[in-house]
Curated annotation (Swiss-Prot):
Involved in the promotion of spontaneous somatic homologous recombination (HR) events, which is opposite to the function of FANCM in ordered HR. Only FANCM is essential for replicative repair in the absence of the endonuclease MUS81. Acts in the same pathway as FANCM to restrain class II meiotic crossing over (CO), and acts with FANCM during meiosis to repair interstrand cross-links (ICLs). This common pathway between MHF1 and FANCM is in parallel to the pathway that involves the RECQ4A helicase. PANTHER family: CENTROMERE PROTEIN S, CORTISTATIN. It is found in: Nucleus. This is Protein MHF1 homolog. It comes from Arabidopsis thaliana (Mouse-ear cress). Residues 208-242 are annotated as: Disordered. The lineage of its organism: Eukaryota, Viridiplantae, Streptophyta, Embryophyta, Tracheophyta.
Amino acid sequence: MFNISYAKRNAKYLFKLLAWCMMIEEAGPNIGNKQKVVLQLSKMLIMYIILHINAAFWTWRGYLKRCVLHFVFPRIFLPLLSDSPTITQAKKPSYCFAMDVGGEDISDLQVDQIVEEYSMDDLIRDRFRLSAISIAEAEAKKNGMEIGGPVVACVADLAFKYAENVAKDLELFAHHAGRKVVNMDDVVLSAHRNDNLAASLRSLCNELKAKEPQSERKRKKGSAKKEDKASSSNAVRITTDL
């Protein structure tokens, strides 16, 4: 990984190489094969340095995101996050560039996509840990208990891994059914594999039913009664016809 200082040291050579390449291109068709090879190598070197600068910029942008998160959320969670080795160790940005045989088509779009995915994964993981830590501390206060920082960090990591496994199961269920989108059928199948998750879903359904307005309940009950009456009247008509 090349850091900002490395990119700054090579930035001054970037402009010299650009000026040199412009002078060679202005020479037109009179240049020989040797000069053309030098021109292509110079372009490759320029893109190589640009990629280093770009990777360093994306790395520091990820650090800025983490700093914003630490300032937005309460400060009582900061020592717990700093103790976690997976948060303190920054991921190295993966970067590459593609070119054709002639060396003319060079793009760094893959750099932006790969580093952006890494930064979003870190952001989601940090937010999930903060939520798990806040829930654990709230439950500890409710029950009059005390929880150590390393214990809460381990619980948060386990909860995140469990959530990742549930997401993978849902994706596999949807893929097995020939779908690209997860629906409630996949959630039900995943709940059958875990009693605790099934109980949580049942309690959530009961809470939603309890919060449902009374008018909608009466409408549903009235429509159900009308359907029962219609079915019974149809049965009576069929018996009289016979």
